[in-house]
A protein has these predicted regions:
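Residue-level signal for inorganic ion chemistry
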Residues: 29, 58, 89, 120, ...
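Core subunits and conserved enzymes of cellular information-processing
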Residues: 240, 244, 248-250, 320, ...
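Conserved short loop/turn motifs at secondary-structure junctions
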Residues: 40-43, 72-80, 102-111, 134, ...
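Long, charged, mostly alpha-helical binding arms that flank functional sites
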Residues: 262-346
Length: 587
């Protein structure tokens, strides 16, 4: 499908079409006036920001309308599942600010699903097929031509029952037998052409062990699990639109099996689809993300360049900023490619109100204040957050020798350069006005690199004194005292991919070059997605912060201490710059 890039969300309506449906259903008394939702992730990888969109509506609307939302792990494929993923999913949901009513697993229903499948066989609505997957696929037909019935479609019920038992015996080879629902091989919806509902895997399950060797397929599990739990509203993404009629049919059959046919159209889950969260310069397929991790093209699932929730968390995104972004782009029935600038804008706006302001110099050069007393140290006051007075203040040390950014000095500058230059004045944040010497303004090494800048300070201009009101043309610079500066590593992140739509480019490269996904991805990765600065200086107040603390390095951007950070070696991740680095957002 052709995707439009959304650079700016349109004016948001009061409620989404999904929320309006909830309002209508509750008003009409459907499902007894109840609202019960579920978030059903597969425990086969870490959640990404696309999952956050589903989490926000599943949990958010349930809370808003006094309903409940359960967490249900869709653990029907033991090949890919791991308890590591289960734990990470639970942590991510909690971090986003939500709490489930109950935790369930699709495997909780394996026995009921098995019994239901046996009933379908006895009703003549399911049969065991022993053709290969290739033959079954060929017999499905096309969207313009009907399929061909399997030669085993009318196998006797007793034979089907015996073969179905054999499928779960542990003696049946995977791929030799499958159970199919008997529906209509000429149905215009290809999913109705006798879909597979059970297959043999012969792999132990992380929860049920060796009890099951035949496992239900997704389409046979999802709706029935919703029904058995009492889910009223089942929300999923647009690729499941064509699955909805099959979802409804299986729920109807299960209601018949349960003998609940008095009101077949009510007291049942209803599926509604919405658009996925797609971002430019982002790839969100769990299969491809796993390949990145396994091939060590990134540093794990929580690499700050990854679109995983734990990656965003490690990078310094707040959960509130992610939810605000999701709320801004909304829920529609049209897939779109959202501009990364919108997400960064939401993060920037949120962190502006919560980040503590600190000083850090990433590319340092020394300044010596020649008229400042040698050995003298001053404790000055810095406001932690001008957006929130309750965050208080902290002390910063001032001394004769300081670190400033190398880009804030120019030996030969024109009139437009408003930072430090020979004969020019600038203001030091929370401190004094200083002036660069006109004669001998700096020392340089043999390569012409500036090593030391010489200035004088105005003792009457300290912040808070009347002299600080003196007007100057120069800008206000950040700085760190050389006396107590802490050396730190700073990691600067850029987009992981060179191409705007890596999903489509990946598919194109694989087709053009007949190569695997990893080979194609290596051609798309941005070689400059991570820059590590090892000779930065920060103030001690910042060095003491723990991971997941939100900081603003003044005049640079938002940062957070990394999980690798220690007292001896602080490490910081850049979250987002103070200005948009992706695209211009028209406001």
């Amino acid at each position: 499908m052709e995707e439009n890039i959304i650079h700016e969300s349109e004016e948001k309506k009061s409620v989404s079409f999904i929320e309006q449906k909830v309002i209508n259903d509750l008003a009409e008394g459907k499902n007894g006036g109840r609202l019960q939702t579920r978030f059903p992730p597969e425990p086969n990888g870490y959640l990404h920001i696309g999952h956050a969109k589903a989490i926000a509506i599943d949990f958010g609307l349930a809370k808003k309308y006094n309903g409940t939302c359960n967490l249900r792990f869709d653990d029907t494929n033991p090949i890919k599942e791991d308890t590591e993923y289960i734990e990470s999913i639970e942590n991510d949901i909690k971090w986003l600010g939500f709490q489930w009513a109950n935790v369930y697993y699709a495997s909780d229903y394996f026995q009921e699903l098995w019994d239901f499948a046996v009933w379908l066989i006895k009703q003549g609505r399911a049969y065991v097929d022993e053709q290969s997957s290739e033959v079954i696929a060929q017999q499905k037909g096309t969207t313009t031509s009907p399929g061909t019935n399997s030669p085993f479609r009318d196998r006797p019920v007793e034979e089907n029952l015996k073969l179905f038992e054999f499928m779960n015996s542990g003696k049946c080879e995977p791929g030799t037998l499958v159970l199919r629902a008997k529906i209509d091989m000429a149905h215009p919806n290809m999913l109705f052409r006798d879909p597979l509902i059970y297959r043999v895997l012969n792999i132990p399950h992380i929860r049920t062990g060796n009890k099951w060797n035949a496992y239900p397929m997704y389409d046979f599990t999802h709706g029935q699990s919703d029904y058995l739990e009492g889910v009223t509203h089942s929300w999923c993404t647009l690729e499941f639109v064509e699955h909805r009629p099959l979802y409804d049919l299986f729920v109807t059959w299960m209601k018949e099996w349960k003998g609940e046919t008095d009101n077949i159209e009510d007291n049942r889950p209803r599926q509604t689809e919405f658009n996925k969260l797609n971002l430019n310069y982002t790839l969100m397929s769990k299969r491809n993300l796993l390949a990145l991790v396994n091939e060590k093209l990134v540093n794990g699932w929580d690499d700050p360049r990854m679109p995983t929730i734990c990656g965003f968390r490690r990078r310094g995104y707040s959960p509130e900023s992610i939810i605000k972004f999701i709320d801004k782009i909304g829920y529609t029935k049209i897939d779109a490619l959202n501009d990364m600038a919108l997400l960064e804008s939401a993060v920037r706006d949120d962190l502006n109100s919560r980040a503590l302001r600190v000083s850090a110099v990433l590319n340092p050069v020394k300044v010596v204040l020649t008229n400042y007393p040698e050995g003298q140290l001053e404790q000055l006051t810095a406001v932690n957050n001008p957006e929130n007075e309750a965050d208080g203040t902290h002390e910063v040390e001032f001394s004769r020798e300081l670190w400033i950014e190398r880009d804030d000095f120019m030996k030969e500058a024109d009139k437009k350069f408003m930072r430090l230059a020979p004969g020019k004045e600038v203001r030091l944040k929370n401190a004094y006005i200083i002036k660069c010497n006109e004669e001998h303004p700096c020392d340089e090494d043999e390569n012409g690199n500036v090593t030391t800048i010489y200035c004088t300070y105005d003792p009457e201009s300290r912040s808070g004194l009347p002299g600080s009101n003196r007007k100057i043309k120069g800008k206000t610079l950040h700085w760190v005292s050389c006396h107590n500066a802490v050396k730190a590593e700073v990691r600067l992140y850029d987009r992981l991919w060179k191409v705007e739509n890596p999903r489509d480019t990946l598919a194109d490269l694989r087709e053009e070059q007949n190569c695997d996904a990893v080979t194609a991805m290596k051609q798309m990765i941005n070689p400059n997605s991570l820059s590590i600065l090892k000779d930065c200086f920060i103030e001690p107040f910042a060095a003491s912060m723990k991971p997941l603390t939100y900081l603003q390095f003044q005049r640079i951007g938002y940062f957070t201490p990394d999980s690798d950070s220690t007292a001896e070696k602080p490490v910081f991740n850049k979250t987002v710059g103070l200005k948009d680095t992706w695209a211009k957002i028209n406001k």
